[in-house]
Amino acid sequence: MEHIYVGRKNGEKTQGGVYHYLYNEETQKLSLLGLEDVLQGFTYIALTYNRTRLAATGQDSEGHDLLVGYQLDTPDKRLKRCGQVRVGTAGDICHLSDNRAGTLLLVTDFVDKAVHFYEFLPNGAPGAFLARVPFEGKSTGYRQGSSHPHSAYFSPDDRYALVADLGANTVWVLRCQPADNRFDLVGSWRAPDGYGPRHIAFHPNGKYVYVLMEITGHIAVLELHSNGQLTLIELIFAVSPAYETVEGSLNAADILVDMKGERLYASYRSVQEIDVFGIDRRTGKLSPLGYAPTRGMVRGLHWGRSGVLCALGEELP
């Protein structure tokens, strides 16, 4: 059995908050267990790497952005709200991640043109604000008139944080020194104009970085060097021939590498498909393997505990 936590916004028939589901791998059925916590203005949710804590973002009754922390280490995997803090973002949080050590939370705000670092306490509560790192830049495509960070991720060794800035058309590299409250910009890679970096996936070896371009659908394969510099290995286009008929943005959404570093998955909302690539472990390069229809707009891709289940966050058209 796989426990799945889904954040939902307020709707005509749904209450905003974190919902708890149970997935039966044998029957392939997903059952709703209930609403775990009411969270108005929900925006993003993230499960820690050790799967004992969860963080989510929403808003309080006065409209301020909130960062909320939970524990889920009980036998029934129910959530316990452990604390919350107001965050100084601009009301458009679009991504949330934690480091492998479980000591930091990284909040990305599309409108704020910045990422925010917070402590993540062992009891599941968000801790002190550490730093806000702003960015500048622009490009030629839609929503690229200024910096608009779309997501940010810690490298597998926790030394760096990589930011996919759709607006500035750039991947930024920050060196993380939380003991000194320092998160310095040490590297960057700029995509071809109009591509729009959206989400990032790391190979388990920490050497190869895969960047999904929301607008064009390309995937950039980059090498992350020990000094924080990025170099391009290759740019590869999507698999499905259906993409050739799309006018405008492909609306690529999420990208994921499997736990063994052998396969890469990328979701494309415009054609409602997931593309699958093989990974050459020696070079990091990709080879197309196929694609699958999703019958809906897949916004998020996540691995289950077993490494077999791929949970899809579906966005209805």
Model features per residue range: what roles?
Residues 32-102:
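Blade-loop segments of beta-propeller domains
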Residues 31-37, 80-87, 131, 137-143, ...:
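A short beta-strand motif characteristic of beta-propeller blades
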Residues 21-28, 70-78, 118-127, 174-182, ...:
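Short loop/turn segments immediately following beta-strands, especially the blade-tip
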Residues 9-11, 59-61, 110, 120, ...:
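Short loop/turn segments immediately following the C-termini of beta-strands
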Residues 4, 54, 105, 161, ...:
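Hydrophobic beta-strand positions that form the internal "hydrophobic ladder"
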Residues 158-217:
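Loop-centered beta-sheet repeat module
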Residues 14, 39-49, 88-100, 136-157, ...:
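Beta-rich, blade/repeat-based domains predominating
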Residues 78-151:
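Asp-box/WD-like beta-propeller blade repeats and closely related beta-sheet repeat scaffolds
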